[in-house]
């Protein structure tokens, strides 16, 4: 049964959201401490440091209260919360834990210095949020949906000293949509999960491919994977190229993809999925789209063979490989190029893209590190592109709530 949203209260929900963002660290620390005190298994599942845990907590709650302030459609808001609950089943907690979890959330409100009326109304909304998430988690349990899967590494390639391409296999089909991402961890990362976009569409053998850029200790460990390693992978999440799962010229949409670094991964999965669908239907692939892949230098472009093949297969696809510099860093250690590709040097890829796509592009899809995606989104908005025509896919989970 779907939880009913509580009756409207006199509350400045926008002020609650603002207070959460302003006092994010204090709130997260308080909730973290309450979780450790009241839910003992949490000590084995989350990092001891509050700074390393629950990165998505405050942005998600702030987004929720902003939706309340805007009187957003209930179904839209609750769908996001339900997806979050289903994905968090990977931690192994039963749905009943939300009863305790919401008390931790409510206790943390004291750090926000809210008006009494706002605090009371916010607490009621948090209890509603917990019921929605508990119902979604319980429904997934009753449906027999696995909260996570164990996969084994079957292939590793390191095209340069910063990027690793890791292939895993479950041995059984893994259901997901091209462009979705997964939370992953290994025994070397106790309590730490990283979100990675699948770089290829699903296969009958349950294979997954991830492109990992080593930016910190966790991603460096994942990039250093060896064949035979076991990874734990959560449920797929997100939606890429919304409404374009069977994109063709007939749908009247011309997508323009802007990928920064390994932000190419979800775009790659989506494009290959369209090719697979066309072949399965006995048709020649013909994807109308412009694709801009941005990297610091030519050696950072690690997937040029697939990019060239996609461009060759699809006459109406325009593939642009952009670089900040024409020269590779001395210690990049990039593989020798297998094919010759033209790289364009551009200090401002968004402006270059806009110059070329003024008459064609009407859906801009941004993928990559959160800062680059946020900057690109701001440039597009400043140039007059409507917000509804921009789809952002930032790498970190907090960014998912900030940009969408």
What residue spans do the PLM features occupy?
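Short, conserved phosphate/pyrophosphate- and ester-handling motifs at nucleotide-, phospho-/glycolipid
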Residues: 179, 263, 369
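Ferredoxin-reductase
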Residues: 146-234, 255, 295-296, 323-326
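A short, basic/flexible loop-to-alpha-helix module at the beginning of a structural domain
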Residues: 236-250
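Reductase modules of NAD(P)H-dependent flavoproteins
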Residues: 19, 290-404
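Phosphate- and divalent-cation-binding pockets in alpha/beta enzyme and binding domains
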Residues: 221, 266-269, 375-376
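Core of compact, soluble alpha-helical bundle domains
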Residues: 1-149
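Phosphate-binding glycine-rich loops and their immediate beta-loop-alpha structural context
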Residues: 257-278
